Regions:
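N-terminal signal-anchor module of multipass membrane proteins
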Residues: 1-56
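Short, amphipathic, aromatic/basic-enriched membrane-interface segments that mark the entry/exit
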Residues: 12-22, 63-73, 91-92
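Hydrophobic, membrane-inserted alpha-helices
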Residues: 28-35, 55-59, 77-85, 101-108
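Transmembrane helix interruption/hinge and helix-loop junction motifs
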Residues: 38-44, 88-97
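C-terminal ends of transmembrane helices
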Residues: 57-68, 105-116
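Charge-biased, low-complexity intrinsically disordered regions
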Residues: 64-65, 69, 83-84, 88, ...
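Cytoplasmic-side transmembrane-helix entry/capping segments in multi-pass membrane proteins
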Residues: 70-80, 97-102, 117-128
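Long hydrophobic alpha-helical segments that form multi-pass transmembrane helix bundles
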Residues: 117, 122-170
Length: 170
């Protein structure tokens, strides 16, 4: 019994790293980013870049101030920035998005020990704080650029409801 070794997980060693996992998540989120740029315009891309950059800067600064090793290369801050940007209205002022990034990275993620140690999802917690702080901005959503005229939008169960039986017979 003296050879029993008790260690924390993970017990299986593999070549998968945090950086590879986060890169896979970023790649998986790219179609959603392309769609948001197509639907909401270039501001969606700018919002995503600002959120990703802010999250990386806040993580770097926080790790530097706390005298911990640099972890920005694991790309988890970029994933947090993308997830937060995807959860914000495209019309939100950029400084408010940066406040959400600060809450997500510094308060929720880094103050509780970094990746894997946080008590909640950092991006969603940042959104909740923004929702509580800036309710009017967070509940106003942009009309998509894609729909140029009202005829392209169908909000009823079927477009045939607007047709009369006489016009259908013609």
């Amino acid at each position: 019994m003296s050879k029993l070794i008790i260690e924390p997980s993970p017990h299986i060693k593999s070549g998968v790293t945090t950086q590879k996992i986060m890169l896979s998540v970023i790649i998986a989120l790219l179609p959603a980013l392309f769609a948001s740029v197509w639907i909401f315009g270039l501001r969606a891309l700018i919002m995503t870049v600002i959120c990703c950059t802010s999250c990386v800067i806040f993580e770097w600064a926080c790790r530097k101030i706390m005298k911990r090793n640099n972890t920005i290369s694991d790309l988890s801050a970029v994933v947090t920035g993308m997830l937060l940007a995807f959860n914000l209205p495209v019309t939100l002022p950029f400084y408010m998005a940066i406040i959400g990034c600060f809450v997500a990275i510094v308060i929720v993620k880094q103050f509780f020990g970094g990746i894997g140690q946080n008590f909640a999802n950092p991006a969603i917690t940042g959104r909740i704080v923004l929702m509580l702080s800036f309710t009017s901005y967070m509940t106003t959503w942009a009309e998509p650029f894609y729909y140029r005229n009202a005829g392209e939008i169908v909000t009823t169960s079927t477009p045939l409801v607007s047709e009369t039986p006489a016009s259908l017979a013609d």
